Regions:
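Hydrophobic/aromatic beta-strand patches that form the interior of the parallel beta-sheet core
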Residues: 4-6, 34-36, 85, 108-109, ...
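Internal, active-site/partner-interface "lid" segment
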Residues: 143, 155-194
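Gly/Ser/Thr-rich beta-alpha loop segments that engage phosphate groups in nucleotides
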Residues: 58-61, 93, 115, 119, ...
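Structured adenosyl-cofactor binding patch, chiefly the S-adenosyl-L-methionine
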Residues: 118, 122-169
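N-terminal nucleotide/polyanion-binding subdomain common to many enzyme families
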Residues: 1-74, 197, 201-225, 235
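Short, solvent-exposed amphipathic alpha-helical segments in soluble enzyme
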Residues: 20-24, 100-104, 126
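S-adenosyl-L-methionine/SAH cofactor-binding core of RNA-modifying enzymes
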Residues: 63-114, 120
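Fold-independent oxyanion-binding glycine-rich loops
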Residues: 8, 38, 87-90, 112-115, ...
């Protein structure tokens, strides 16, 4: 998979790209990540990428020309640049289902905003999808792009040592993940549930499903709406 990232601050990605799963996936050729500073497409000698908003108001707005020129240059240089995803608090929520859809693509382009956002003409005529990583505002789209990068890359075949690792995680079946335990079996008087030590795989499966339902009901009850079949599979 190829992922292009359009940003004014490519140095913010240096750390995340050089550690853990993303680093290993890049080294293995599972994913190629290209950082593009769209300031390089600014049209004046000062490399200006923003200007004051029409109609007044605080802050600065990213100009359309550098973004359009950078994206069009990117698209003309390769057969498939993939859809352009703009990271924005106004976008649709990033969900595991959306992450799976993105991970199935051969290519993807992430656009990081700054300041008061993008000129709306970029959103209307260039962006394929606006995506938000949560109901809060960040200083720029770079942290959100890193979230998308990590979530997508770890789903790519060969990115994890054990592809089974992603199958039992939160949201994969509409539920949050069940509790996990490891050695020692007893710690400060707190014991690991006996069923996990029993070796009875069906009993363990049922316990995990029940715990998933309970955790979801406690922390994300919205996920259970209209999921009577899932709730029936776990008993509180």
């Amino acid at each position: 998979m190829r992922i292009d990232v359009l940003t004014l601050f490519p140095e913010m990605f240096t750390g995340p790209l050089e550690y853990s799963i993303i680093k290993r996936a890049r080294q293995a050729g599972v994913v190629k990540v290209h950082l593009v500073n769209f300031r390089d497409w600014a049209r004046d000698k000062h490399h200006t990428v923003d200007d004051t908003p029409f109609g007044g108001g605080p802050g600065m707005v990213l100009k359309p020309e550098p973004v359009f020129d950078a994206v069009e240059a990117l698209r003309s240089s390769q057969e498939a640049a993939g859809p352009l995803i703009y990271l924005s608090p106004k976008g649709e929520p990033l969900t595991q289902r959306l992450v799976k859809d993105l991970a199935a693509l051969p290519a993807l382009t992430l656009l990081c905003g700054r300041y008061e956002g993008l000129d709306q003409r970029v959103v209307d005529h260039l962006v394929d999808r606006e995506v938000s990583v949560g109901d809060y505002v960040l200083s720029g789209g770079e942290p959100a792009a890193i979230v998308v990068l990590d979530a997508v890359v770890r789903l790519l075949p060969g990115a994890l040592g054990d592809d089974q690792s992603t199958e039992d995680e939160s949201f994969n079946d509409g539920l949050l993940e069940y509790p996990q335990y490891t050695r020692p079996a007893e710690f400060r008087g707190w014991n690991v549930p006996e069923v996990l030590l029993s070796g009875h795989h069906e009993a363990i499966r049922r316990w995990r499903k029940e715990m998933s339902v309970n955790v979801t009901r406690k922390n994300r009850p919205d996920l259970l709406r209209g999921q009577d079949d899932i709730i029936a599979g776990g008993h509180s």
